[in-house]
Amino acid sequence: ELAKIVREIKPQVVAHLAGQVAMTTSIENPRLDFETNALGTFNVLEALRLHSPETVMIYSSTNKVYVSLEELRYIEIATRYELPDYPFGLDESLPLDGSSPYGCSKLTADQYLRDYHRIYGLRTIVFRHSSMYGGRQFATYDQGWSGWFCLKAFEMADAEAPEFTISGNGKQVRDVLHAEDLVQVYLQAADQA
C-alpha cells in the first residue's frame, strides 16, 4: 500500500512522524518497538528508493539515541542541575548509544537514513527531538510528559483533584519545542535539501 501511494503521488517531501514513542512500551514489548520504528522506517525508505528517489525524507528521531544522560557529570545548585562539561547545553557531539529498546530502534532507523543517502543518494534529513508539545497532544505520563504535567497541574487547582507524582526532585531542566515551530524547521530543511 505504501509503495503504491509513493509511486502514484511521487511526493516532494515525506515527513516520517510515525513511530512508537513510549519508553515503557519499548521495554514491555521490544518487538513492537523495533517493528514500528526500525522496520517501519525501512519500509518508507524502500518505497522512496524504488518509486520516488528524488523525494526529500525528513525523519522524526529522538534524543534517546545518545548515551544515557546518567553517565554525564552534574552539579546540583539551588534551583537546578547543571552540566559543567556542557555549559551551553547538549549537542550532537554526544556519543551514540541507544541505551534502551526505544533508543536502539530509533538509532537503527537513523543509520538506515544515513546509509540510504550514502548508497542510494536519497535526500534524507534526521531531527533528534526531545520534548514536544502542542495542540491535539494526547499526553500520558510516559509520552508527552509536558502536556501531562500541565494537565495535572491544572487539575490540582481544584482542591478535589487527586495528588500526582513528579519524577525526580523538580530540579531537572528540559527543553520543550512547540509542534508549530518544528514544522517551520522541517519546511526550511526541506527547502535546503
Identify the role of each PLM range.
Residues Q20-T24, N63-Y66, L96-S99, S130-Y133:
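Active-site segment of SDR-like NAD(P)-dependent oxidoreductases
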Residues Q12, R31, E35-F42, S99, ...:
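Conserved internal alpha-helix in NAD(P)-dependent oxidoreductase domains
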Residues E70-P87, P101, Q111-A190:
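NAD(P)-dependent short-chain dehydrogenase/reductase
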Residues F42-S100:
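Conserved Rossmann-fold NAD(P)-dependent oxidoreductase catalytic core, especially the SDR/UDP-sugar
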Residues T24-L32, T55, S68-E76, F138-A139:
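Conserved catalytic-core motifs of eukaryotic protein kinase domains, centered on the activation segment
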Residues V14-Q20, M57-T62, F127-H129:
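SDR active-site strand-loop-helix element
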Residues L2-T36, V65:
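NAD(P)H-binding glycine-rich loop region in Rossmannoid oxidoreductase-like domains
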Residues S105:
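Active-site helix of classical SDR
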